[in-house]
């Protein structure tokens, strides 16, 4: 499975890391994903969601 939020679709971004001497190096920014057990349609599913969606209560967390 890829590192993508299943709620909002947020994924990895690529770009350049720029040092003080202006040397550009490729790097990847990854989303802060959390595995959450939730109940969807009467079934318990484990989904990957970003911390922003978890904070926003888009999906209720099953305890």
Curated annotation (Swiss-Prot):
GO terms for cellular component: ribonucleoprotein complex; ribosome. The keyword Ribosomal protein applies. GO terms for molecular function: structural constituent of ribosome. GO terms for biological process: translation. It comes from the Bacteria. Keywords: Ribonucleoprotein, Ribosomal protein. Coiled coil: none annotated. The keyword Ribosomal protein applies. Disulfide bonds: none annotated. Belongs to the bacterial ribosomal protein bL28 family. NCBIfam families: L28. This is Large ribosomal subunit protein bL28.
């Amino acid at each position: 499975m890829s590192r993508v939020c299943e709620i909002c679709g947020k994924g990895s971004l690529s770009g350049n890391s720029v040092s003080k001497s202006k040397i550009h190096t490729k790097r990847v920014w990854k989303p802060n994903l959390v595995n959450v057990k939730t109940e969807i349609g009467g079934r318990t599913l484990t989904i990957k969601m970003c911390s922003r969606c978890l904070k926003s209560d888009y999906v209720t967390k099953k305890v």
